[in-house]
Amino acid sequence: MLNFRVSGEGKTIVFLHGFLESLTMWDYLPLEQLGSRNIFIDLPGHGKSPLTDNSEHASLEFMADEVIAVLAHLEVTEFSLVGHSMGAYVGLILKQKLESCNLLVLLNSNFWCDNEQKKIDRLRVVKIVLKAKNIFINEAIPNLFWKPELHKDEIKKLKDEALKMSSEAIAYATLAMRDRKDFSKEINQTPSGYVLIHGVYDKLVSISDLESRINSLTQLNIITNAGHMSHIENSEEIMEVLSKIF
């Protein structure tokens, strides 16, 4: 079973971290202020969770099924979910599979599949990671921040944590993201079931790209002075938005 941590009491909110991260990413936010039962989970191959998929094809569906096993173990009957980046990709699958998932909050993420160029880039990452993961990690993590020079300590901590991952786990997650499905139809048909939170300076997904793909009814919250790591770069605004949602 995946590694998890539970804190607080009240309505259940599940938190899923992003690529190269772990459940410790949520420590940057005072989530106890939400007055909820918070469940934090390490996705397969990340943090303290092993990667146990022996199939030939990497998939986010496998990650989602592993999360479902944790929720069943904890006897969760109804919940909301907050997913950061890759965690939201897994969340999209869970939202589709489980009627018990009332709301999905996509934090610095998107809901469409990779284009052909992005798929090529993912394969390039896999080749680099399998040869020298430290090169990839040292380049990738600072680029997630709007102003990396302001977050040297946090970047070092993130790098150290990512370096503990096996090259195989990083490659697996990369390939799983490469082959993910497009959920544009689901989000635009039922906008009340989804909320987007996004850093205005996110280099991975632009605000204009998001705005061009969403229904006018879909709630998009833009975080100022933040890139892809808005929970670190502007935790105060993130908490303001989460407090309004929950």
Where do the protein language model's features map onto the residues?
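Conserved loop-alpha-helix segment in the C-terminal half of the alpha/beta-hydrolase fold
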Residues: 191-226, 232
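Flexible "cap/lid" loop of the alpha/beta hydrolase fold
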Residues: 89-133, 137
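Conserved HGGG/HGGXW glycine-rich cap/lid loop of the alpha/beta-hydrolase fold
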Residues: 2-53
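Conserved alpha/beta-hydrolase catalytic His-Asp/Glu region
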Residues: 114-120, 131-189
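Alpha/beta-hydrolase fold catalytic core
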Residues: 1-13, 33-37, 72, 76-77, ...
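Post-His helix in hydrolase/transferase enzymes
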Residues: 232-244
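Active-site loop/oxyanion-hole signature of alpha/beta-hydrolase fold enzymes
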Residues: 30, 37-82, 93, 240
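Conserved alpha/beta-hydrolase "nucleophile elbow" surrounding the catalytic nucleophile
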Residues: 17-19, 79, 83-85, 199
